[in-house]
């Protein structure tokens, strides 16, 4: 298991913020913290207050995952496993992390997973030291995550 957790918060980038970031980047106007979140391997530590302030802003929608969905993530998605991922097609694009999961144990952050459903890339940081993420992210897992995320975005 990648994270020791009892609850999961899901953050979804709002479409209007995504469009404004792309437009501003084209104009040379950059929000370096937001660009780090959206495009990069950031944060590099769990207790980064700037990261949490930014994802708790109006730029993201926040959802508390149900116990059932958190259990699904624990038992089927974020686990150490052997997969045949190496035989799947690799995608070569720059990730755009629109979907972020924050894992908590007793209200303390135990991990972060940033997911790019568009190109199949991910960034994971955990309080556990020896996690193996190489086999994470099969097409089936991304399809399951997309379905899960969409179920929370519905109004």
Q: Can you say where each PLM-predicted feature lies in the sequence?
A:
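Function-determining sites in protein domains
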Residues: 1-155
């Amino acid at each position: 298991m990648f994270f020791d957790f009892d609850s999961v918060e899901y953050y979804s980038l709002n479409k209007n913020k995504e469009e404004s970031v792309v437009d501003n980047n084209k104009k040379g106007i950059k929000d370096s913290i937001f660009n780090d979140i959206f495009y990069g391997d950031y944060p590099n530590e769990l207790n980064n207050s700037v990261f949490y302030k930014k994802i708790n802003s109006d730029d993201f929608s926040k959802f508390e995952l149900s116990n059932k969905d958190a259990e699904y993530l624990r038992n089927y998605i974020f686990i150490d496993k052997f997969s045949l991922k190496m035989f799947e097609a690799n995608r070569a694009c720059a990730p755009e992390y629109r979907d972020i999961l924050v894992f908590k144990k007793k209200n303390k952050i135990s991990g972060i997973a940033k997911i790019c459903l568009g190109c199949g890339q991910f960034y994971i940081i955990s309080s556990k030291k020896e996690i193996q993420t190489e086999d994470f992210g099969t097409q089936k897992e991304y399809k399951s995550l997309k379905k899960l995320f969409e179920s929370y975005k519905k109004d």
